[in-house]
Amino acid sequence: MIKVGIAGIGFMGWMHYLAYRERDDIQVTALCTRNQAKLDGDWTSIQGNFGPPGEQVDTSAMSKYQEVEALLANPELDVIDVCLPPHLHKSVCLAALEAGKHVFCEKPLALNDEDCDALVAAAEGAGLQLLVGHVLPFMPEFEFLYKAVQQGTYGKLLGGRFERVISDPLWLKDFYDMEKVGGPLIDLHVHDAHL
């Protein structure tokens, strides 16, 4: 059984929790948020512009923390799932790796190349897994595009134009803050650029 601790119980933390709940080989055993109501299991305030709204969650058997350092000190955890605002990703992921935990991080991994490279180097140096939550590669239309480019179905790819028609993420109040989130280019376009 893989034991996961989720850092950040907002919309993406909720989405990740729902995915874990469907698995027999993964168990969320710890939560970290500064919101006491969420630690107590009231996730009804969570909403986004896709997916189901939050609900009451039985957190009685989970370890609960308000500080990331305490979560990382839990010796029973195998994986830390980082669902915090993007400007916190590098520091929390690095601390988790230094604590000997595998890391699953909601995208973007960090706000610049140097920080991403530092995290990859830290994971490789520690012999730990670092996975970024890119979901689009698993969607049929993106699988098709990837195969078409790899196989040269339409010839050699010389360039690309990406256009995203989507509303701003309702759960990300700082969406346009370049220092905290990186704006739409980093937060959303990272999906397309990853491919």
What are these regions (language model features)?
Residues 1-99, 117, 125:
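N-terminal glycine-/serine-/threonine-rich beta1-alpha1-beta2 phosphate-ribose binding loop
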Residues 2, 128, 155-158:
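Nucleotide donor/acceptor-binding cores
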Residues 8, 107, 152:
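Conserved G/P- and acidic residue-centered "switch" motifs that form tight phosphate/ATP-binding loops
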Residues 88, 108-110, 131-138:
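Rossmann-like NAD(P)(H) cofactor-binding subdomain of soluble oxidoreductases
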Residues 103-104:
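A short hydrophobic/small-residue beta-strand
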Residues 109-129:
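Rossmann-fold NAD(P)-binding glycine/threonine-rich loop
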Residues 136-195:
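Predominantly a Rossmann-like dinucleotide-binding segment in NAD(P)-dependent oxidoreductases
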